[in-house]
Amino acid sequence: MKRLVALAPLLAALPGAACAQTASETVIAKGNPILADGRFYTTDPAPLVDGDMLYILTGRDMAEPEVNDFIMPEWQLLSTRDPASRKWRHTPGFIRPENVFAWAEPARAYAGQIVKGPDGRFYFYAPVLEKNSDAKDRFAIGVAVADRPTGPWKDAHPSGPIISQKLPVANNIQNIDPTVLLDDDGRVYIYWGTFGQLRGMELERDMITPKGPEKRIEGLTGFFEAPWILKRKLVYYMLYAGNKAGPDSACTPAVYHACQAWGTATSPLGPWTYRGVALRPVSSTTSHAGAVEFKGKWYMVYHTADAVGGGHFRRSVAIDEMQWDDSVSPAAIRPVVPTRAPQPAPKPTRNIAGSASAVSSNVVPVQYWIAALNDGKVRANPLPPEMWGTWNGNNPKQPWVEYRWAKPVTVDGSRVYFFADQPAGSGIGVAPPAAWRLEYWDGAWKPVAGTSGYGTTPGAFEEVRFAPVTTRCLRMVFDASGSGPYAGVGVQEWEVLAPRPRVPAAAGVAAPACGKN
């Protein structure tokens, strides 16, 4: 990877650098994600079918492990003649913004799409940063053209982008995530947008020139970003990253995570009707997908954080079949069930928290996710949904969080990893609790006796040891920092320790409560 970065300036200086690529290689995927070994991270997939070949255009994440930023210098290409064969061709360094668009800055190669035009050529719609622009947000959408999906590519509109905050009409949104449909009648439509702002517009039949007018799109509940338009049986479908969050949301409990939602329309520019969720949140906070029919089957491509060394800014593309329910009208997208390559057997551990169900006294604020408590991960630079917390502006004085097991367990220790953004004693933000304790259920809630002490230092595990107790429910009870108002409590990970290591059991259905809470 470092070698590729070092070569990039040399490649950019070569004549015809728009077609300079790192050598392709054949990859045999073991399952999802397609590239799983951590050498290359692929993101924001956009599928394309041409003849007997399925292509997937992807971005490339190159952030260091603890960097929370989208470091994306180039696009890559995956291709296969049969997804079931798991044989893929991978081309890194496929396109760089500055090598195709003279008006673009390097880096920020965000989600684009390649579409075959009526003239048989291929059009690449790319969001890039426009240099020398005084727009408040310099993201703009350019169009490149090639005779083949593999390039070489040249700017189809060398004078600059076709969409920005200044043209074809002024807007104040971030102009990224383009998706394009060539309709059966030869008319062309483009959608784009993020941060809850979706726009749509007709293009001229040259695939390049805006025809307009630009239209603000409503009706797609929870739209956040990443639109993907397709047509099936005279119905227009829109996939998109939705983040209508809440404890009872069909999409996501945490606002930082997104689902793949979908809606339908009977005309290419709407009106649109929300229909449901096609893919629940995956391991990455962002959700970006595309869907296409290939050799009689429909596939959804999306990204996750499941590759070796992966994360929210080191994502990797996956592919699964997408099926339809034609018994209803309009036909419904059945929820896609994500698959993953076989994983190594878990190693024995004393920590049995992963097999418990977690509940808390408070309605978990949408920036947090209670599932993070026992996901087995501690991060140096966590995002809010990678922890459980109580902060909501009106924080409880004595909150608790509880693990429930389906059957009684014997435990003799616990470790908790506190998060804080305020010092101890503070009554604002998230601060270490003034005190906390463990209680277990034995016909009633009882304090765990003989504990070794309850530390409250954030940013490291605080361990508590005690004589073994057997129970089905264990809880942490906190005295929040402050004297009113109170600070929130934040926990990144809570482990519960059995006396001896054992292979951890997988979490099943939610375990029932112990008595009355």
Where are these regions (language model features)?
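Bacterial N-terminal signal peptides
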Residues: 6-16
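Short proline/glycine- and polar residue-rich coil/turn motifs
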Residues: 280-281, 453-458
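Beta-rich carbohydrate-recognition and catalytic domains
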Residues: 21-109, 115-176, 181-224, 231-236, ...
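Predominantly extracellular/luminal regions of secreted and cell-surface proteins
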Residues: 190, 195-204, 344-382
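Aromatic, loop-rich ligand-recognition surfaces of beta-strand-rich domains
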Residues: 382-449, 458-517
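Positively charged n-region of N-terminal signal peptides that target proteins for export
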Residues: 1-4
